[in-house]
Structures are given as C-alpha cells and as structure tokens.
Design a protein with these regions (language model features):
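Conserved NTP-donor binding/palm subdomain of two-metal-ion nucleotidyltransferases/polymerases, i.e.
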Residues: 1-123, 129-376
Length: 376
C-alpha cells in the first residue's frame, strides 16, 4: 500500500537514506497515514518529513494544523522532561545518592540520538537505582510534591495508591508504583518510574534474560547535556543494549501487556527509530559485542537486528552487527504466558501496519485464557 511505503520512506530519510517518493502527497489516503503514524508514535516525524520535503503546503490545512500542534506539544514536553530529569539528577545527588542511580530511555535517548527535533513521544522518566536507595528516593520525591498512584483515564483524576498497593507492587515487580507530580495545567504533569532491575518479564517461569548486574550501569555513568541541562545515564553502548533488549521483550512477551488486543504495544515504529539512529552513531562495537556476550543476550540481538533489516532492507548496518542477521523465519516468534514459543503466520513487514491481523493471528494460535488481557 502506498501509504505504508510513504511512512517507511519517511523513516529512511530520517536515517539519512535517500529514497524517492512515488506518490504525490495529495494522492495519498491521509486517514490511513494519520492513523498509523499515531499508533506508531511518529506524528512528529511525519510533520518533520513534510517540511523537509517541502510538501506541507500540499496537504489539507486542518491536517497540517493538527500535525503542527502535535509537533509543538511533543517539542515542549521533550524539553520539559529533559529539564525535570536534570533537576532530579541534582536533587538526588544532593541527597546522598552519589552515583548509584541513572536515568534510562526517554530523555537520555532524546539527547543522545537527537536528529534535530523532538522525535520521541514519552510520558514518564525512568530511573534505575539500587533497591536500598529507594527510601531516600521516595523522601526526595515526596518533598518535591510527588505522590504515588495513577490517573483515571475516564475522569482524568489522580487516585493515590494505598500503602498496601505500594508494598505489593514493589514486592511483585522490578519497580515502584508510579510517582506523579500534578499541576493545574496537565501538560506539565510528570511521571517518575523507579526501577531496581533492568528486566523482569519472564518466559513462563523462566527469566527471558539472565540477570544483569546493574552495578556497571552506575560505575560507568556519564552525563548527557543539552541547553545547559545535564542528566546522569549509562554509557551509550549500555543504553543501546538496553534499548534493543527492551524492544525485544516488548515484541515477544506482549501477552503480558495489559489490553494488548487494543494497544498493540508489541510493534511500534518509534522503537525501531531508536535502533536506526543508534546504528548511525559511532559506538564502540567491540565493547557492544563484549557486553552482549557477557549478558548472554545473543538471541535477543538476532531478533532485533534481523527484524530491523527486514523492515529497512536499504539500511547499511555496521559491519560488526552483521553476525546477528539470521533467517527471518527463525526470529518471527513470540511467547505465550505458558512459555510456549509461537511463530507468526506473516512476516514483520507484512503485519507492521496490520494491527488487527496480529490479534487474529494470536487468537488463532493461542488459547484466549493464556492471554493476560483476557484475564483482567
């Protein structure tokens, strides 16, 4: 479909791979493009692409205004989240944390991968720290006005978590109940997730990855800076590996995701944008390969690199990572909550924009009672 090709070519341009546009913008079905761009969290990239190709004036004016508003909102939120993460870096350091914490994902990726505009859409700040630092972190966040709980989507009201809910969540997972700082204008609301391990999702009763010692993430930390803001984070090589493993776990363990059947969080182009922008960076690939072997996550990299190449065959990979290109059929799988490995009946390129077909495929091959979404 021309609309799908348009979106893929848009990302090629973002990666610096020049491709031609075969179909004029005014001949495309923008209902499809806007729907898919929203689901894949790439509306800011879409607006950037229209401006880069000098085609913004050719689309419907109301669509243009909507995309521009989304672009400006994402730009504001990105800068605001970076500023908040920088402030929290200072506050945590002032409260005897020293360097036993780092920020993950969101603002770190935004600063390091920066393609010249705020391409990432993220709503929370993820912090990795030692579990013994949790009490100190809670006190710091509380003094700054943060409360643990959740937002009711139907009423937009904040519901504070009970002590029982907080303890149960910390006991049963790798993270705390989310911390919210609520403002009168919700555009300024901030969510902080505190994690005390990198990965916790399991393939049935077994860990998807061997436990990763987080001490090296603290020991080898660096500071990511932009516009006088400074955020503590892992080295770029560690961030790259964590980003790939996060994509992999979301892609193969989506049966654990709440309401996957309507959110389709297993496959989003924004996650592959992160990978593509990383691959354009000059990482220390000898270190990357050493860490992959140390963490014993070769299977995950077989999956990520092969699937990335399947979606973007024109992208030239770093030579060192070509060892992870496998037969695409061998990495076209997911796990049920019972730990069974199931194979898709379609390729990743075929189901990338066919969300409902993914659901039908999973329901055909997986007992409905094995899907977490159907248990809730």
């Amino acid at each position: 479909m021309n609309e799908y090709k348009y979106l893929i070519n848009m990302l090629y341009r973002l990666f610096g791979v020049e491709v031609s546009s075969d179909v004029p913008e005014d001949k495309l079905n923008w209902n499809i493009i806007l729907y898919q761009a929203t689901l894949h969290r790439v509306t800011s990239v879409l607006f950037w692409n229209l401006q880069k190709t000098k085609k913004a004036s050719t689309i419907n004016n109301n669509i243009y205004k909507m995309l521009k508003s989304q672009y400006e909102y994402n730009s504001y939120r990105d800068k605001y989240c970076i500023k908040t993460a920088s402030e929290l870096t200072k506050k945590f350091k002032q409260n005897s944390f020293k360097s036993d914490f780092v920020f993950l994902k969101g603002p770190i990726l935004s600063i390091y991968l920066d393609p010249g505009f705020s391409y990432r859409v993220y709503s929370d700040l993820d912090v990795l720290m030692k579990k013994e630092s949790l009490s100190n972190a809670k006190k710091t966040l509380s003094n700054l006005g943060y409360k643990q709980g959740k937002i009711d989507k139907n009423t937009d009201e904040f519901i504070e978590a009970t002590r029982t809910e907080i303890i149960a969540h910390e006991f049963g997972s790798h993270e705390t109940v989310e911390f919210y700082r609520i403002f009168d204008n919700s555009i300024n609301n901030i969510i902080v997730d505190i994690n005390y391990s990198l990965f916790w999702k399991k393939n049935s009763q077994e860990d998807l990855f061997p436990p990763i010692n987080i001490e090296s993430f603290f020991k080898n930390h660096i500071y990511y800076t932009k516009n006088d803001e400074s955020i503590i984070g892992p080295t770029p090589e560690q961030v790259f590996i964590q980003t790939c493993l996060h994509l992999y776990s979301e892609a193969v363990l989506f049966c654990w995701q709440y309401s996957w059947y309507k959110n389709w969080g297993d496959l989003e182009l924004v996650k592959f944008i992160d990978i593509g922008l990383f691959l354009n960076k000059k990482l220390d690939y000898r270190l990357v390969l050493d860490l992959i072997r140390e963490y014993q996550v070769e299977e995950a990299f077989d999956f990520v690199i092969t699937q990335f190449k399947e979606i973007f065959p024109l992208f030239k990979l770093p030579r060192e990572l070509e060892i992870f290109i496998k037969n695409v059929d061998d990495v076209n799988y997911y796990f049920t909550t019972l730990g069974e490995k199931k194979y898709w009946s379609s390729s990743i390129a075929e189901r990338l924009f066919e969300q409902q077909s993914r659901v039908l495929d999973v329901y055909k091959n997986t007992n409905l009672e094995d899907l977490y979404a159907k248990k809730s």
